[in-house]
Amino acid sequence: SWSIVYIVSIIIVIFDDIKKFFKMIKVILTGATGMVGEGVLLECLQNDKVKEILSISRKSCNISHPKLKELLVSDFLKLEDYSAKLVGYDACFYCAGVSSLGMDEEKYTKLTYDTTVHFAKVLSDINPSMNFIYVSGTSTDSTEKGKVMWARVKGKTENDLHKLPFKGQYNFRPGFMSHFKEQKNIKFIFKIFAAIIPSLFPKSSLT
């Protein structure tokens, strides 16, 4: 399993190198009401190198902190309507996502590919010097030709994100992830799996 702390630590190291002439950074975050996004948010709030976090979501994450700002956007495909509020950010953690269970390819593509790539294009136009980090998933299919629908869609998403003119664009493919004890957006069944997966697959786990 991947630890959220581990992922954010890697990204912070990247920022340390890229932003070596600056003391602090401002980041945009999506998915703060989900498990991964909430974990990234908590880590950013605790990290001294992060000056400000703008959480863009369809609903509030219900967390109050001096470093945190919220922008509620009902439709990410209309993000350009909020362009004035997106200026001056150094990075974006795109952690929003949906499960493919019960979805046909058209609907899943709209929610996973169309929404993500449009969101990123808007940001690249406003902040071309930004680093864009996309939380994808293990077994994502970069060839876009495999039999697994969700893997093809995520592969196309990664490929097209990488074409955008950001300062840097990074795709993370975690498998099963552990969580912070402080997190609230964790399903009970996930807590059970999080406790046993490292023991069952120790060579494939990072804790």
Describe the residue ranges of each PLM region:
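Acidic, Ala/Val/Gly-enriched low-complexity intrinsically disordered segments
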Residues: 5-8, 13-17
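NAD(P)H-binding glycine-rich loop region in Rossmannoid oxidoreductase-like domains
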Residues: 27-28, 69-126, 139-141
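N-terminal Rossmann NAD(P)H-binding glycine-rich loop of SDR-like oxidoreductase domains
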Residues: 27-46
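Rossmann-fold NAD(P)-dependent oxidoreductase module
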Residues: 39, 43, 122, 160
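Oxidoreductase cofactor-interface core, primarily capturing Rossmann-like NAD(P)-dependent enzymes
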Residues: 46-49, 66, 142-207
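Short, polar loop motifs at secondary-structure junctions
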Residues: 55-62
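Conserved Rossmann-fold NAD(P)-dependent oxidoreductase catalytic core, especially the SDR/UDP-sugar
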Residues: 59, 98, 106, 110-156, ...
